[in-house]
Regions:
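Short, solvent-exposed amphipathic alpha-helical segments in soluble enzyme
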Residues: 23-25
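Short acidic active-site motifs
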Residues: 43-47
Length: 153
């Protein structure tokens, strides 16, 4: 039996995207999927390029619609090197706040646009959580993951 595996790449400023990633990881582990939760400040581009497992990006948004500081180097390296990612399957769970409508969840949206432009295969439509709606992002994320992503891993 082949073990299922998922890499979760995290870009966060305050830790919310990491909390989301850890809750998804716990859900996966309870459902027969091994995970690696990797914060982007510890990632090199080759870890994405060489990935044989699906990738889930969890990213908050910072400033004026920016990728969080700990994800900037990784994002910029992917953007600069423009590797062919046609072998990568991915999805995105982005975090934002509709109070900032013009830049809502841009951290996650930027990763989605970049990965898609490099031919990565989207296995599920991204979800963008709105902090202003009062829901807990980790609960929303696990439900979204269970319904939309798990079946593709």
């Amino acid at each position: 039996m082949t073990l299922k595996h998922l890499n979760i790449f995290v870009a966060t400023m305050t830790g919310t995207a990491l909390m989301v990633a850890e809750d998804i990881s716990d859900f996966c582990n309870d459902n027969g999927v091994n995970t690696n939760v990797l914060e982007m400040d510890n990632l090199e581009i080759n870890e994405l390029i060489k990935s044989k497992s699906p990738v889930l990006v969890t990213s908050s948004t910072y400033g004026q619609g920016d990728v969080p500081d700990n994800g900037q180097k990784f994002y910029n390296a992917i953007n600069k090197n423009s590797p062919n990612l046609s072998h990568i399957e991915y999805s995105v769970f982005g975090l934002g706040d509709m109070t900032y409508r013009d830049t809502f969840a841009y951290g996650g949206k930027k990763f989605d646009k970049l990965l898609s432009s490099l031919k990565a295969k989207k296995i599920a439509e991204p979800f963008y959580h709105d902090a202003s709606d009062g829901s807990l992002p980790e609960e929303v994320a696990v439900k979204w993951f269970q319904k939309n992503v798990l079946k593709f891993i």
